[in-house]
Amino acid sequence: MRKKSLYKMFIVAGVAAMMMTGCGSDKNKDTDTNASKTEAPADNNEADDEENYDTGDASLDNTRNQDEIGENELLVVSFGTSYNDSRRLTIGAIEDAMEKEFSNNFSVRRGFTSQIIIDHVKKRDNVTIDNITEALDRAVDNGVKKLVIQPTHLMNGLEYDELSEEVAKYASNFDKVAIGEPLHTSDEDFDTVMKAITDATKDYDDGKTAICFMGHGTEADSNQVYAKMQ
């Protein structure tokens, strides 16, 4: 699996997912929160606030924690969100796109980095989502030999570092392990993302609609990606 091929699929799927959940114009007034690329401070607010309204049908989301993985696995790692519709239309859309592209060679599975989100979904909806350790244990138990991990993180922040450290502990259990880079890594990545979001939002360029892309930021030096995108 070539890195650029995976990058392209990640970017296109990610932009498509954002558009499916609304851009803030009259064409779609519903708003969702996609926390898959954020840092930990969002956990408590999301888990507490959503109890006041319906977040969608959890049963429609494929948690991708099934066994019978095979020898090759593509593990898609996200921060996670407990908003059911948002999880299905954003994180799920990225996973579905990767499965469509690489299903001949890899089984696609899911792992979330936010344990608070995982616990909240389990308590509220009785839906089980693997954390990173559980996802890696599942890969080992299923005899996976080649493990490719693609995070949906926006930048090389604290969570990406923690992911890399956790994966390193399991490296000896596989014949080959590869971890994809975050969305914004090289100058070429920035150009690709800017073109993708411009193309995806061009129908809203009517001189009246403002589109704002938001992120929670990070304490890591990689927070500079926001200024660079501006």
Model regions and ranges:
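Alpha-helical transmembrane segments
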Residues: 13-17
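Bacterial N-terminal signal peptides that target proteins for export
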Residues: 2-10
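C-terminal motif of bacterial Sec signal peptides marking the signal peptidase cleavage site
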Residues: 18-22
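Active-site-proximal alpha-helix that buttresses catalytic centers in soluble enzyme cores
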Residues: 24-230
